[in-house]
Design a protein with these regions (language model features):
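Glycine-rich phosphate/pyrophosphate-binding loop and the adjoining helix
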Residues: 2-17, 58, 148-195
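N-terminal beta1-alpha1 ligand-phosphate binding loop
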Residues: 10-42
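A general structural signal for well-ordered alpha-helical segments in protein cores
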Residues: 16, 29, 33, 70, ...
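Short hydrophobic segments within beta-strands
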Residues: 19-20, 49, 122
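A generic structural motif
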Residues: 41-48, 148
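N-terminal beta-loop-helix "entrance" segment that forms/cooperates
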Residues: 51-68, 163
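Helix-loop-strand module that forms the ligand-binding subsite of alpha/beta enzymes
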Residues: 65-146
Length: 195
């Protein structure tokens, strides 16, 4: 039996699978994901998942047997309470590696790992719009996959080369504070979709 005196102090911890839509080791979005892990409130436990082993989506490959890397991604998403996606912006759009991960995760349609999951999107870019376009293009995919995306606040880290140091650590205090606020809001948002 739970002691009522301690029950209110025991907060639920949500497991979040996080991935960056960049394969580059020095990616600002990988760095942003590391910063999110560092700044996450106690209610969030963020585990990263790499996307570099995923083959391009191909229905023939799927029909012949789902690749192990895809099964691992799907399992990580299914076991998590939510997703945290750090997206770059390539040519004003969503990077192929990220769209590919969404495509594989949404298959098969009736067994989608994304169905009913809470998600949040953030991004960092050396440009002045901070991945606004790629984020706005990514969100409609969540409508089809029945994934519930946090809409506000938006983490659009512009001029990322000025916000991260040479080791990839987020050093801009205003951005750190905003990211911490975003993560707290995300934890509250996840609570609406889990029991």
């Amino acid at each position: 039996m739970t002691d009522p005196a301690t029950a209110s102090s025991e907060a639920r911890v949500y497991t979040v699978v996080g991935f960056a839509g960049s394969l580059r080791r020095g990616s600002y979005n990988r760095a942003l994901l590391r910063a999110a892990i560092e700044l996450a409130p106690p209610e969030l436990h963020i585990e990263t998942h790499e996307l570099d082993a995923l083959p391009l989506y191909n229905g023939d490959v799927e029909a012949a047997g789902v690749p192990q890397s895809v099964e691992e991604l799907r399992a990580a998403i299914r076991q998590a309470d939510a997703l945290l996606i750090a997206t770059p912006e390539y040519n004003h759009g969503v990077p192929g590696v990220l769209k590919n991960a969404i495509d594989w995760s949404s298959r098969p349609p009736r067994g989608s790992a994304l169905n009913g999951k809470a998600a949040a999107v953030m991004g960092a870019s050396p440009g002045t719009t901070g991945t606004a376009r790629s984020q706005s293009q990514l969100r409609p995919a969540f409508v089809f996959t029945n994934t519930y995306a946090l809409l506000q606040p938006e983490v659009l880290v512009a001029r990322a080369h000025e916000k991260f140091d040479a080791d990839g650590r987020l050093v801009d205090q205003a951005t750190r504070d905003f990211l911490a606020t975003f993560l707290q809001r995300f934890a509250e948002f996840i609570g609406r979709f889990t029991t």
